[in-house]
From Swiss-Prot:
It comes from the Archaea. Its cofactor is Zn(2+). NCBIfam families: PRK00432.1. Zn(2+) binds at residues 29, 32, 47, 50. SMART domains: Ribosomal_S27. This is Small ribosomal subunit protein eS31. It comes from Nitrosopumilus maritimus (strain SCM1). The keyword Nucleus does not apply.
Length: 57
């Protein structure tokens, strides 16, 4: 049986590293919780899992 290949390089697009600190770039969905990020559009943030939409002011 083949082993796991490792993590996807696309995961690193969600985080920013500044020295010793790691911060999230995208907003976390308030309904789904940790691990689910919201997509950023021109006028709103949308969760692809539950469909929650937060409009920007």
């Amino acid at each position: 049986m083949a082993g796991k290949k490792g993590s996807s390089p696309n995961v690193y697009a969600y985080f920013k590293v500044d020295g010793d600190k790691v911060s999230r770039i995208k907003k976390v969905c308030s309904r789904c919780g940790k691990g689910t990020y919201m997509s950023e559009h021109k006028d709103r943030n949308t969760c692809g899992k539950c469909g929650l939409t937060e409009f920007k002011q």
